[in-house]
Amino acid sequence: MSNEISIKIGSLLNEVRNKKPLVHNITNYVTVNDCANILLAIGASPIMADDIKEAADITKISSALVINIGTLNERTIESMIASGKKANELNIPVVFDPVGAGASEFRNSTTKRLLEEVKISVLRGNMSEIKFISGLGSTTKGVDASENDARTGNDEGIDVAKNLAKKLQCTVAITGATDIISDGERVVILENGTKMLSNVTGTGCMTTALIGAFCGAGSDYFIGAVSGIISMGISGEIALDKAGKIGTGSFHIAIIDAISNLTSNIIEKMNKIKEI
């Protein structure tokens, strides 16, 4: 447990609810509704604009930009690039979720282009996606991490996150049974969460959206990433306790309920943060 970091997270949560940052999501149509609702639950304001005619204009008035390639298509790629460049121009944080990177040439080339043309603030993905981007040869299972990559040890995962963070000059977050976050210097391991989160589609996308909310309310994007990820992990534990035995549908709704009721005191009591 890290009291210093948990205090920073609690303070940033209060900032989110005070500032209500507008978070521009160019995301996928599988989870877009959940991303909007999770942002409302944490206290942020979501907007989902993916047409090239307005995407950059919407980014211009936003506090953060979230790019998610879950349901990738040619039309939205140009919107992602235009919005990303506008965000860079205005020093607006960009959170990138490279869903399924390594699964197809289309995703691979798009991920490469985004990383080349847009300065990313936080890169969040599973172990397979992050290993692929690092050039380490992953074996992705669609949009999920492969069993082999998911078994990657913490020491190796820390090296992967730190090295990629230094290379891209951003915060890298690898989420899974254990979460690893690094900005190239600082490293945190999070052990909150529950296996049941993987039974609800979109919990990763929702986590990325939450990171956008926290980054939009503060200037330390490493803490923003830690805050978004631990908020989902703790809320998953609370949801499991309240609705896990009922089924995945009730558990799904209970996650959003838990996010809406999350407080700095809950984070302080329930966090499983390890500073490395």
UniProtKB/Swiss-Prot annotation:
Designated name of the protein: Hydroxyethylthiazole kinase
HAMAP family in UniProt: Thz_kinase (MF_00228)
Binding annotation for substrate: M48, G202
Lineage: Bacteria, Bacillati, Bacillota, Clostridia, Eubacteriales
Keyword ATP-binding recorded: yes
Family designation: Belongs to the Thz kinase family.
Lineage: superkingdom: Bacteria
Catalytic activity: 5-(2-hydroxyethyl)-4-methylthiazole + ATP = 4-methyl-5-(2-phosphooxyethyl)-thiazole + ADP + H(+)
Binding site for ATP: R124, T175
GO molecular function: ATP binding; hydroxyethylthiazole kinase activity; magnesium ion binding
Broadest EC class assigned to this enzyme: transferase
Cofactor(s) the protein requires to work: Mg(2+)
Entry keyword set: ATP-binding, Kinase, Magnesium, Metal-binding, Nucleotide-binding, Thiamine biosynthesis, Transferase
A Pfam match: HK
Gene: thiM
BP-aspect Gene Ontology terms: thiamine biosynthetic process; thiamine diphosphate biosynthetic process
Enzyme Commission number, as recorded: 2.7.1.50
Functional summary from the UniProt entry: Catalyzes the phosphorylation of the hydroxyl group of 4-methyl-5-beta-hydroxyethylthiazole (THZ).
Pathway(s) of this molecule: Cofactor biosynthesis; thiamine diphosphate biosynthesis; 4-methyl-5-(2-phosphoethyl)-thiazole from 5-(2-hydroxyethyl)-4-methylthiazole: step 1/1
Organism: Clostridium beijerinckii (strain ATCC 51743 / NCIMB 8052) (Clostridium acetobutylicum)
